[in-house]
Amino acid sequence: MSVLIAIDQGTTSTRTVAFDKDLNVICSEQKEYPLIYPKDGWVEIQPKELMNSVYTTLDPVINSCSDVCAIGITNQRETTLVWDADSGKPIYNAIVWQDRRTAKQCMQLKQDGNE
């Protein structure tokens, strides 16, 4: 039986779901992770938490299936995470889409007609 796997990394958790050819759920796993608020208006997630949540949810789903034909990945809006190309390590925490640290700059761009 062909199986489609979806990995949905949301704002506070990762969910991995396996579907059969008729889109019936075969298996589903979810792992939450904490948001970090280092300063007022800042919202971050530790990169290791994000990666661990993928492994934690994907492993049992894949192990319960055979004949995986595709894996789709969704993520949380404009959350940004930068990795060092040489070391493979994250440069900083993921900056979550809710983060407001650049609100003033964005407002200025909008006022200048750069929307």
Model-derived features: positions:
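Glycine-rich phosphate-binding loop plus the immediately following alpha-helix
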Residues: 98-115
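N-terminal glycine/serine-rich phosphate-binding loop of ATP-dependent small-molecule kinases
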Residues: 1-92, 104
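Glycine- and other small-residue-rich loops at beta-strand/loop junctions that grip anionic moieties
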Residues: 95
